[in-house]
């Protein structure tokens, strides 16, 4: 299951979110590997920035970002037929000459639905592979086959089975690529 919905949020609400998230008011936290966790290994160009909105199941952080994004996340949760928001965070990767593919990964080993909501027009597609998480963190990237590539487009929502291995790319033609990555069950 892979679904792409353009213009997911009402335009005036999306512009409110976008104006804040892409402004100097947005707090960002450095991460040495933006796809960190059991799959991520540090390396040149794998860094990025994030800001958690929901870190633990259904617990919104006490922040302006969380308040601003609550309605959007509830709309996602309801629309995909899930009961829980497991995790949600803003992610930003930055310009890298030539672009770079981040590490293929899953966001959680537990069954879930993953979403990516793009905050800006950029390059650096999200890639969803045919291969699924089968319990091992060792991935032979040379054996992965692409199921679908999705280009970052402002106000676009990508929904997919979170057990598909997936990744993103750093932008090669834009200053940044900003998205809201969320997981539901």
Regions flagged by a language model, labelled:
Residues 1-83:
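Non-heme Fe(II)/2-oxoglutarate
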